[in-house]
Curated annotation (Swiss-Prot):
It comes from Xylella fastidiosa (strain 9a5c). It catalyses: 2-[(2R,5Z)-2-carboxy-4-methylthiazol-5(2H)-ylidene]ethyl phosphate + 4-amino-2-methyl-5-(diphosphooxymethyl)pyrimidine + 2 H(+) = thiamine phosphate + CO2 + diphosphate; 2-(2-carboxy-4-methylthiazol-5-yl)ethyl phosphate + 4-amino-2-methyl-5-(diphosphooxymethyl)pyrimidine + 2 H(+) = thiamine phosphate + CO2 + diphosphate; 4-methyl-5-(2-phosphooxyethyl)-thiazole + 4-amino-2-methyl-5-(diphosphooxymethyl)pyrimidine + H(+) = thiamine phosphate + diphosphate. Keywords: Magnesium, Metal-binding, Thiamine biosynthesis, Transferase. Condenses 4-methyl-5-(beta-hydroxyethyl)thiazole monophosphate (THZ-P) and 2-methyl-4-amino-5-hydroxymethyl pyrimidine pyrophosphate (HMP-PP) to form thiamine monophosphate (TMP). GO terms for biological process: thiamine biosynthetic process; thiamine diphosphate biosynthetic process. The lineage of its organism: Bacteria, Pseudomonadati, Pseudomonadota, Gammaproteobacteria, Lysobacterales. Its EC number is 2.5.1.3. 2-[(2R,5Z)-2-carboxy-4-methylthiazol-5(2H)-ylidene]ethyl phosphate binds at S163, H164, T165, G192, I212, S213. The keyword Lyase does not apply. Its cofactor is Mg(2+). This is Thiamine-phosphate synthase. GO terms for cellular component: cytoplasm.
């Protein structure tokens, strides 16, 4: 094993497998009631620009998810590692979208799984008891229940409004959130969310709002983030 430093923390790297084992301080138990903005990165091919766009936003969010549907494996690894170093400096957990192998390799704090990705139980076994594992559940309560049984830390519902980024045939409603208060894990709302339309979503019980373009594509992303936060009274 050899030791490398990411941010101000040590991590152990297995020379044979290349798998990173985070220092225990890096993976903490999921906060009991996370509430606020769950920021998801855009499809950005310039790593330096991605970091520059993301850094000013970290102090105002709960979690960061790395998502880039256009990048190849090498670029995804480069960007994920750069974001992880940034997140280590601020204490914000970094999750990887749809790539359990990448999450494990770089020692990310968790992974978000879609419909055709790995089972949450596999992710839990590979990433450990404190990893944050999320599952897209669209508008399906039964899928959410099964995901939680399999080890999911949170479930995502959406889309709530039309979205250019998150295109699915599924449409979720505030009523769905009211029907899932018993699930016992945070519920993430996603899809076309803006500061002007999120009040009903928050009132219905969503603990977290997943946002991409509403913040990154705004004229002033920091101001946009504050507008979202104001709806949570945070």
């Amino acid at each position: 094993m050899e030791v490398s430093r990411i941010g101000s923390f040590q991590e152990h790297i297995d020379k044979t497998t290349g798998i990173v084992t985070p220092h225990p301080l890096l993976r903490k138990p999921l906060m009991s009631q996370p509430r606020g903005i769950y920021l998801i990165t855009p499809d950005e091919t310039d790593t330096a620009r991605l970091i520059a766009r993301t850094a000013p936003l970290l102090n105002g969010i709960v979690w960061l998810q790395y998502r880039n549907k256009l990048a190849n494996t090498a670029l995804r690894t480069e960007q994920a590692q750069a974001l992880l170093a940034l997140c280590r400096q601020t204490g914000i957990p970094l999750l990887i979208n749809d790539d359990l192998e990448l999450a494990q390799t770089i020692g990310a704090d968790g992974v978000h799984l879609g419909m055709h990705d790995s089972n949450p139980s596999i992710a839990r076994a590979q990433l450990g008891p404190h990893a944050i594992i999320g599952v897209s559940c669209y508008n399906q309560i039964e899928r959410a229940k099964q995901a939680i049984k399999a080890g999911a830390s949170y479930v995502g519902f959406g889309t709530f409004y039309p979205s250019h980024t998150k295109t699915t045939p599924y449409r979720a409603t505030p009523e769905l959130l009211r029907q899932t208060t018993h699930l016992g894990v945070p519920r993430v709302a996603i899809g076309g969310l803006t500061p002007k339309n999120i009040a009903p979503i928050i009132e219905a019980g969503a603990e977290l709002l997943a946002v991409i373009s509403g913040i990154y594509s705004a004229k002033n992303p920091v101001t946009a983030l504050k507008a979202y936060q104001s709806q949570f009274n945070i």
